[in-house]
C-alpha cells in the first residue's frame, strides 16, 4: 500500500522516515522517499560546508570535530568496526596490500564500498601497533585499568584459536608458534588467515577500552568446531566489556555456544 512507511528513531527528536511516493518531478521516477527530522535537517544545513577538501585531503581535526558533533546529534558515541567475510584474500595479499592501495587512484578507491574500504584502511593503520605482538598490547593494558584477568583470558582464547600469536615485524605479518619459530601469514592455513584480523581487532579495542559496535560476518569461516567455540567465547568476552556485537553466521557451533553462554548467564 502507498501509505506504508518505516520510521527509524535515533532519539526523540532525531529520526529518518522512509515511505513510498510516486514523484514525477524528476525524469527518473522515484518511488522511495526519505524524510528527515527537523533537527537532522538543521544539522546538515549548518555543516554543509564544514569539511573543506585540500590537495592533502580533509583535515583530521575538522573530521574529528564533525564526527563528534554527529555523534552528539544521534546521541551515540559508539564507533563502528565492520569485519567482512572473505577476509583470507586480504590477509593473503598482506605484503602487497600497501602497494596495491597506494597505486589506486581516487576514483578506484571510491569504487570500493565504504565498509570494505574502512576495513582495509583500518588494517593498514593498525598493523604497526602489533610490532610486539598481542603481548605488547597486553602490556600497555596494564596502564589502562583493564582487569589483568580479562587480558589473560583473551590472550588464552586467541592462542587456542590461532595456534600461535600474531606479530608484525619488518613489514611482514607473522604467526609465531610456541617454539619461537614463525610462519608468514600468506603461508598459514585458511582458517588462520580468516580469523587473524577478527582476533587482532577484538583484542586491540578491548585493550583500548573505547566503546565499539563490532559487525562481524561469519566468524566461523574455515575453523574447526572447537575453534568456533573459542572464537564465540572471545566475542562474548569482548561484548561483556562494554562493547556491542552484531554477528552473521551459518554455524550451529556458534549458535550452540551462544545458547550455552546465555543459559549460564555469562552474556
PLM segments and residue spans:
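Switch/communication elements of ASCE P-loop NTPase nucleotide-binding domains
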Residues: 1, 170-267
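P-loop NTPase switch/coupling surface
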Residues: 1-115, 256, 262-267
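Low-complexity, serine/threonine/proline-enriched polar segments
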Residues: 2-4, 24, 114-151
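A short, compositionally biased
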Residues: 2-5, 11, 162, 168-172
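Low-complexity/IDR signal
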Residues: 64, 69-70, 89, 115, ...
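A generic structural signal for alpha->beta connector loops
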Residues: 77-79, 163, 242
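C-terminal or late-domain output modules
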Residues: 91, 97-134, 185, 200-203, ...
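Conserved P-loop NTPase mechanochemical-coupling segment
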Residues: 134-148, 154-155, 163-187
Amino acid at each position: 500500500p502507498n501509505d506504508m512507511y518505516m520510521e527509524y528513531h535515533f532519539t526523540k527528536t532525531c529520526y529518518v522516515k522512509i515511505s513510498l511516493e510516486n514523484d514525477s518531478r524528476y525524469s527518473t521516477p522515484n518511488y522511495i522517499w526519505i524524510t528527515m527530522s527537523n533537527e537532522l535537517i538543521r544539522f546538515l544545513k549548518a555543516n554543509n560546508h564544514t569539511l573543506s577538501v585540500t590537495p592533502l585531503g580533509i583535515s583530521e581535526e575538522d573530521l574529528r570535530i564533525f564526527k563528534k558533533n554527529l555523534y552528539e546529534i544521534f546521541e551515540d558515541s559508539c564507533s563502528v568496526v565492520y569485519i567482512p567475510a572473505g577476509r583470507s584474500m586480504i590477509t593473503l595479499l598482506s605484503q602487497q596490500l600497501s602497494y596495491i592501495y597506494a597505486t589506486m587512484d581516487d576514483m578506484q578507491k571510491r569504487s570500493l564500498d565504504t565498509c570494505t574500504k574502512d576495513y582495509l584502511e583500518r588494517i593498514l593503520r593498525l598493523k604497526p601497533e602489533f610490532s610486539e605482538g598481542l603481548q605488547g598490547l597486553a602490556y600497555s593494558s596494564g596502564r589502562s585499568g583493564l582487569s589483568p584477568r580479562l587480558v589473560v583470558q583473551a590472550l588464552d582464547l586467541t592462542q587456542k584459536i590461532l595456534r600461535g600469536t600474531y606479530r608484525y615485524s619488518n613489514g611482514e605479518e607473522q604467526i609465531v608458534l610456541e617454539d619461537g619459530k614463525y610462519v608468514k601469514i600468506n603461508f598459514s592455513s585458511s582458517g588462520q588467515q580468516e580469523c587473524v584480523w577478527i582476533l587482532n581487532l577484538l583484542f586491540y579495542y578491548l585493550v583500548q577500552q573505547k566503546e565499539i559496535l563490532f559487525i562481524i560476518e561469519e566468524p566461523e569461516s574455515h575453523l574447526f568446531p572447537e575453534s568456533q567455540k573459542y572464537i564465540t567465547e572471545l566475542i562474548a568476552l569482548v561484548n561483556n566489556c562494554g562493547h556491542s556485537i552484531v554477528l552473521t553466521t551459518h554455524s550451529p557451533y556458534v549458535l550452540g555456544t551462544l545458547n550455552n553462554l546465555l543459559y549460564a548467564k555469562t552474556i
